[in-house]
């Protein structure tokens, strides 16, 4: 837990975490690592339709059979510990907004990611749009508790898919000067957003610093699809950061037990974290192992369940043993409206992430309906709660350089 946190904040986190802290469970953590090593060695990870990834893993000692590569977990840990930074600086257009991510730093909070639907302040329900997206970015900028404006806060359903990465980039750069997350629609989109963001930040590349953090998901069980693999490679080679995550549904895409989910998720993220270091030693990474019980009767995850919080505490400790920053989830819920269920479930998940020492907390505001909806009302309430941990107001963003804005608009028009 960072020493910079206020005394009362540390006391609250200690109170929440006291019953769960796994630091003393050395035998349990070693058992998870050994079991994940066995999964990697005997079952392997499936890397779909990406010969480059399979070739580089074979050169690193992996044994490939078709698109399945069996790996040495201990060697993957050595690669990660040797090269991956324990802390890095995520830069914004405004240097005053730069945020450290990792060891000793307070958690970074970012809003919901990927919601197709929106509930407006008046209760009306709409599909996401370009206009609404800009309003959500502006709300994230104005919220002192949110130190990152995220990515794909809602889906721009009124914009063609090939234009969305640049439209979202323009919204993040013009409506805020905080750091934000990168785009993974395709390797080409990721690289375009990286290059244009670097031009907007207008500071030379520096060791231990980057401009964007990208969400790279494994697909449980034990699979990586081609687009995340190719994006991971492009991002690492550019020196930008990746948040390599396994997001499991316990009993559906992972074992139903906490221990089983941790073993599978750890095996999946070890492969992705090591790949980033193989492509570019020192590439910034964040590790995420997240698992939620899956209700087979309703065919829906149960967000807020205590089992997921136990997964978070052990995942955080596994990340610290690797020496990398750790991801947590924010105020996520299965509730359909912003009610007592929403507050109770979201509060439990967010508290577990904070108390576990998570470095980057995604979905920190706005989440409803298993993530299918972003609510303006809940967005504001979650952000207001987070603001109590920091400063009360945010100044307006610095103006975006006109040449950068013109270049982005020109590319959008060509698309």
Name these PLM-found stretches.
Residues 1-28, 88-113:
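N-terminal basic/disordered segments at the start of proteins
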Residues 2-11, 22-35, 43-58, 377-415:
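Catalytic-core signal marking the mid-to-C-terminal active-site face
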Residues 17-21, 298-303, 331-338, 366-378:
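Short beta-alpha connecting loops at secondary-structure transitions
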Residues 28-32, 37, 101-123, 321-333:
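N-terminal small/glycine-rich loop or linker at the start of catalytic domains
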Residues 51, 55-120:
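Glycine-rich, N-terminal phosphate-binding loop and its surrounding beta-alpha-beta segment
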Residues 102-104, 108-112, 132, 141, ...:
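Short juxta-domain linker segments that transition from a proline/glycine-rich
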Residues 124-355, 359:
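Helix-rich catalytic cores of soluble enzyme domains
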Residues 359-367:
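Short acidic/histidine-rich active-site segments
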């Amino acid at each position: 837990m960072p020493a910079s946190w206020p005394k009362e904040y540390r006391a609250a986190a200690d109170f929440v975490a006291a019953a769960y802290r796994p630091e003393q469970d050395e035998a349990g953590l070693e058992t998870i690592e050994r079991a994940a090593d066995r999964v990697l060695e005997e079952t392997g990870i499936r890397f779909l339709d990406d010969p480059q990834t399979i070739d580089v893993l074979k050169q690193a000692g992996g044994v490939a059979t078709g698109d399945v590569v069996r790996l040495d977990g201990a060697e993957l840990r050595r690669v990660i510990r040797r090269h991956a930074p324990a802390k890095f600086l995520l830069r914004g257009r405004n240097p005053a907004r730069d945020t450290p991510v990792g060891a000793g730093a307070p958690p970074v909070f970012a809003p919901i990611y990927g919601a197709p639907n929106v509930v407006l302040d008046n209760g009306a329900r709409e599909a996401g749009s370009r206009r609404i997206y800009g309003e959500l970015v502006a709300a994230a900028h104005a919220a002192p508790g949110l130190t990152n404006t995220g990515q794909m806060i809602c889906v721009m359903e009124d914009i063609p898919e090939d234009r969305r990465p640049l439209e979202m980039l323009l919204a993040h750069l013009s409506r805020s000067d905080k750091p934000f997350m990168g785009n993974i629609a395709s390797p080409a989109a990721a690289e375009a957003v990286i290059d244009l963001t670097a031009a907007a930040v207008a500071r030379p590349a520096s060791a231990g610093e980057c401009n964007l953090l990208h969400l790279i998901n494994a697909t449980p069980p034990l699979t990586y699809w081609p687009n995340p693999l190719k994006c991971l490679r492009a991002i690492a080679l550019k020196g930008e950061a990746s948040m390599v995550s396994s997001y499991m549904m316990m009993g559906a895409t992972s074992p139903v037990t906490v221990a089983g989910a941790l073993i599978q998720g750890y095996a999946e993220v070890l492969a992705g974290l090591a790949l980033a270091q193989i492509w570019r030693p020192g590439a910034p990474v964040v590790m995420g192992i997240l698992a939620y019980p899956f209700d087979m009767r309703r065919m829906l995850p149960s967000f807020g369940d205590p089992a997921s919080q136990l997964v978070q505490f052990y995942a955080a400790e596994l990340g610290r043993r690797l020496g990398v920053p750790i991801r947590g989830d924010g105020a996520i819920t299965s509730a359909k409206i912003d009610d007592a269920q929403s507050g109770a479930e979201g509060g439990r998940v967010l508290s577990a992430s904070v108390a576990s020492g998570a470095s980057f907390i995604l979905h920190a505001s706005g989440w409803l309906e298993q993530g299918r909806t972003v609510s303006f009302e809940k967005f504001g309430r979650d952000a207001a709660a987070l603001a109590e941990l920091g400063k009360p107001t945010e100044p307006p963003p610095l103006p975006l350089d006109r040449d950068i804005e013109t270049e982005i608009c020109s590319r959008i028009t060509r698309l």
